[in-house]
Amino acid sequence: MAMSLLGITFGIAFFVVTQAQTSGFEAFFIRTILGTNGAIKVSDRFQDMDGTVSRTDQDGKTRFSFRSREESRYTEGIETPHLLRKALSQFKGITGISEILEGNAILDGGSRSYAISFHGIRINDHISVSDLGNQIIIGDLSSFESDKMSVLIGSRIAQRLMISQGDRVTLKGGTGNIQLRVAGMFESGVSQIDKNRIYLHLAKAREFKGERFSGSIFQVGIQNPNVAPQIAAQMQETLGHRVVSWQEREKVWLDVFKALRVSSAITVSSILLLSGLGIFNVFAIMVIEKTRDIAILRSMGFSGSDASAVFLWQGIIVLIFGIIAGTLLGILAT
């Protein structure tokens, strides 16, 4: 009986631990992604702006036809960011909008060079749609905000180039080279970002890339990230731009977490099944050993169902205590 109780206890505890661990990793991943790349991204414009076409028939009625944009071509970037920003602000649930100009360049730290991806941002807008303010590990945002020739670099980039706060670096490529001062380092928790991304001011990024107005994208923050797919679909249909929610962008990783939860549940269920078989064997042997006692109970007027109930209640009590003990053990372990 004790072995059966231990089997249930450790089976439930293992289930709680594995599910909590997977859920914790998933929550951390989602929090990191939302704090870095935002809930929604608005980018390229559809070339066919006739996604919805209205026509007036001979009877005077206006009818609408909808064309699928699945095979549509795109015009790279946003051509009129100020107008699109105004349109985005009209949607409900929007908490912030940040215009970003992306590009690739070479960052020269003096003794070493490294290929990076730069994001031109307006810092006050960007901290409203990201967690950049809490990701700074060296330096501060006020220093970056006050110096238009400054840059924030990923922690992995700083390690590879062996540069520190206040050092001068050169951004090479685009229309030429520009000298920047390192205002700070950030650590997002995503190694791919920390070893490839830098932030500089949007105006300086436009000057470096040679694009005065167009070519940027928008990162949008919303109150409830869980409804991002619905809001993204509304934006795409209304604005005629490619709009991607974080669920669509990170679908592969979210599917991985689902698979991990299912696999761990199957594993633990197998353990519990074995524990159940153990309980069955224990009670089968117990019934055989208690044959004389059962006969005495029957002679005293107890029915067969009454005698069976004694053993069933023993099994239920073992199960309940095992579940409670396993749950508490799992909570303590996590």
Tell where the protein language model's regions lie, with residue ranges:
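Short, strongly hydrophobic transmembrane alpha-helices
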Residues: M1-G24, I33
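Basic-flanked hydrophobic alpha-helices used for secretion and membrane insertion
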Residues: H119-R122, D140, L152-R242
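Peri-transmembrane interface segments
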Residues: M1, N224, P229-F280, M286-I288, ...
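Membrane-spanning helices that line or support transport/gating and their immediate boundary helices
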Residues: A20-F28, T32, F283-M286, T327, ...
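Short acidic/glycine-enriched loop/turn elements at secondary-structure junctions
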Residues: R73-R181, E207-F208
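Hydrophobic, regular-secondary-structure patches
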Residues: Q19-A115
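Alpha-helical transmembrane segments of integral membrane proteins
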Residues: S4-F14, R261-N281, G315-G326
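Transmembrane alpha-helical interface segments in multi-pass membrane proteins
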Residues: A284, R292-T334
